[in-house]
Amino acid sequence: MSYFGTDGIRGKFGQMPITPEFALKLGFAAGKVLKRTSPKNKPLVVLGKDTRLSGYILESALQAGLNAAGVYVHLLGPLPTPAIAHLTRALHAHAGIVISASHNPYFDNGIKFFSSEGKKLPDSLQEEINKELEKDLFIEDTANLGKSVRVTDANGRYIEFCKSTFPYHFDLNNLKIVVDCAHGAAYSVGPSVFRELGAKVVALYNEPDGLNINENCGSTHPESLQKAVVEHGADLGIAFDGDADRVVMVDKFGNLIDGDHILYILATQAKNKPAGVVGTVMSNMALEVALEKANVGFVRAKVGDRYVLQALEENGWVTGGEPSGHILTLDKSTTGDAIIAALQVLTVMVEQNKALHELVHDFKLYPQVLVNVRLEQMLDPYSIPALVAEFNKAEEQLKGRGRILIRKSGTEPVIRVMVEGDNEQEVKTLAEHLANAVRSQAQVA
């Protein structure tokens, strides 16, 4: 069986496969594969995590498994997922491992791998690790064990890398920024980057206790940030998710600037416009229309940053992302990076001498409603004839005026129901109707 989903291995801590025992075996299996494919006798892996309490246990287990397989480990501590991708390359490691469940609740956790290039691990290597997991764990001769060391300057290295993506002749001296860290991996480095570039920073949700990650805060819950920006009289707000690979922003009036807005800014307002942009099937139709008017290419990929990355590489483009705030700028970073994405928007603000709301003044999203239907067990909505009939009826109703999208989450038992169209009330009603239909059929199935 394959343990890897669309974004590594993920689940509830204490239940397979997110257990200390499995993490030990996974570390050993990955270590054996890396030893076979590494030009070095003892390959190096960098290992980082977000702020979940369970991350410390999984870190110890993974580290032990890797060392037992003869792999050296550099422990980075709590850092954003893109920081681990960067440090994998910067420290010339053979691979990077992140312990995180991103925007999920604290009781979930996950494990994913980066290649030596700081990109998602190729499917072929994941399959090799799967095969190795079926074998028994055995300890190498003591002389062949690996060892672990803690990297004490990991935060500083990453902060400097982020700052290097912001033009050296620009500064943020005149800006007041509220930064929502989601009690997550960017709780320290996030505010530091913007402060060191000159901004006056108000940091929110930057006191992780291992259990409060993403709890009514961060990019998935921006309401308190929207309120705080107005209360503090700030120029803008920035919200990360738990592992800081997603970002949403807020203008000075408290309006939300999501991933579609950010792509619009980078594609149409920047001094150097990209040849094309990759969105996803979730990207608002307004983005597609706006980019067409600006003579910027646009293609849709499946949901998931690995598919956006794949489409970018196929088209030879560098800019892409999702409405949720996964933004890729491949000329700056190998993976989605919330801090770097925010810095690219700030770069446009400085070079255009415009406020955030001015950059999106001419960009209006079509009404779109997304309903997440959480299930006890995952099901395929298109395998149920009654649901297919409902979907077809909705598509016919919106023909030429909008669209629907029904898809399964790749990381949790959730069916996402998205409806988009030119009439807001119709869109809301239709989305709730379809979500209720999914709930009803799930109870019957």
Swiss-Prot record:
Its cofactor is Mg(2+). It comes from Acinetobacter baumannii (strain ATCC 17978 / DSM 105126 / CIP 53.77 / LMG 1025 / NCDC KC755 / 5377). This is Phosphoglucosamine mutase. Pfam families: PGM_PMM_I, PGM_PMM_II, PGM_PMM_III, PGM_PMM_IV. The gene is glmM. InterPro entries: A-D-PHexomutase_a/b/a-I (IPR005844), A-D-PHexomutase_a/b/a-I/II/III (IPR016055), A-D-PHexomutase_a/b/a-II (IPR005845), A-D-PHexomutase_a/b/a-III (IPR005846), A-D-PHexomutase_C (IPR005843), A-D-PHexomutase_C_sf (IPR036900), A-D-PHexomutase_CS (IPR016066), Alpha-D-phosphohexomutase_SF (IPR005841). Belongs to the phosphohexose mutase family. It catalyses: alpha-D-glucosamine 1-phosphate = D-glucosamine 6-phosphate. It is an enzyme of class 5 (isomerase). The modification Phosphoserine is found at residue 102. Catalyzes the conversion of glucosamine-6-phosphate to glucosamine-1-phosphate. CDD domains: GlmM.
